[in-house]
Design a protein with these regions (language model features):
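Bacterial N-terminal signal peptides that target proteins for export
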Residues: 1-11
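Short linear interaction motif-like sites in intrinsically disordered regions of transcription factors
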Residues: 2-3, 46, 186, 251
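Bacterial N-terminal signal peptides
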Residues: 10-20
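Boundary at the C-terminal end of the N-terminal hydrophobic targeting segment
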Residues: 23-28
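Extended, low-hydrophobicity segments enriched in charged/polar residues
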Residues: 33-225
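C-terminal, beta-strand-rich globular interaction domains
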Residues: 230-285
Length: 285
């Protein structure tokens, strides 16, 4: 049996070991400080440009006009639907997005993804000399090792800007609203639309299928008046950040920030969203 003295000596040794294994207060604080530094580091944006609200508003309106009058073709309402002659031609986008161009001998095209409870186009870039994919299944099978959500922005690799702030704003517009045509049922939840000023915001709230009543519109606009809605494009070294305010019937007014590579291919590196003024139309379908 151990003596009282032996027990106390053993306890003392264990206590010393336990204390020695704990990180010191300064070490813990240093680790926390390091984590904070990592979280707040951002590029020093050397060139920050506010896009004219009149320019951006007119551009968005012209872009919407390309697809706004398109009627949904009955032949697309089926799984593995195939496009037909006379369906919308997405190459028309470049008549409005005049600071963008296709590269690498590619053209912009789309297949239609119909799934019973919803349907929407999926943009992709193909070689101009290659035949288009017949349907969505053929598109998926062409690169089955890659999940569709991973390659949803692949087409951007073949779209080049002219390097100006307006060019990168046009690229963001294509990314946000480029697949908003021939939307069926649940796909209509993808309704993000860029707004550039309070006039755009009012039109967004009062228009569409789910327009808000006048008191609600005025209250929301009063809250939104605290913010500058004009798009902003920031550049630094090999990075570009595009910030726009969008409106959605299922979320309200949201500032979206997109960081991408300045040089081709303009890979999307980060996307963030911040709700400025919340709103929900209350419609579910």
């Amino acid at each position: 049996m151990m003596s009282y003295k032996s027990i106390m000596q053993t306890f003392l040794i264990l206590f010393i070991l336990a204390v020695s294994l704990q990180p010191s207060g300064s070490q813990s604080e240093m680790a926390d400080d390091d984590l904070e530094i990592i979280e707040i580091i951002e590029p020093s944006w050397l060139l920050v440009t506010t896009i004219s609200p009149s320019y951006s508003s007119d551009l968005v309106a012209d872009f919407k006009a390309l697809t706004g009058s398109q009627e949904f073709p009955d032949h697309l309402m089926a799984e593995d639907a195939e496009k037909a002659e006379g369906d919308f031609d997405v190459s028309l986008y470049f008549t409005v997005l005049d600071r963008l161009s296709m590269t690498g001998g590619r053209v912009l095209d789309y297949v239609y993804d119909y799934a019973g409870i919803g349907g929407a186009p999926v943009l992709y870039a193909r070689k101009a000399v290659a035949p288009p994919y017949r349907n969505y299944s053929e598109y998926i099978a062409a690169d089955s090792a890659v999940k569709p959500e991973v390659r949803e922005d692949y087409y951007l690799r073949y779209i080049e800007t002219d390097g100006t702030p307006e060019g990168f704003f046009q690229l963001a517009l294509l990314l946000i609203q480029g697949e908003q045509f021939y939307q069926f049922w649940h796909a209509a939840y993808n309704d993000d639309a860029i707004v550039s000023d309070l006039e755009d915001a009012r039109a967004s709230l009062g228009g569409g299928l789910f327009g808000a009543d006048e008191p609600t519109v005025e209250a929301l606009l009063a809250d939104l008046g605290k913010f500058d809605l004009a798009p902003v494009v920031s550049m630094s070294g090999d990075l570009v950040k595009v910030e726009v305010v969008i409106f959605t019937d299922w979320g309200g007014f949201v500032r979206r920030s997109i960081v991408m590579e300045k040089e081709l291919p303009h890979l999307i590196l980060e996307e963030r969203s911040e709700v400025l003024v919340p709103y929900d139309c209350g419609i579910m379908f």
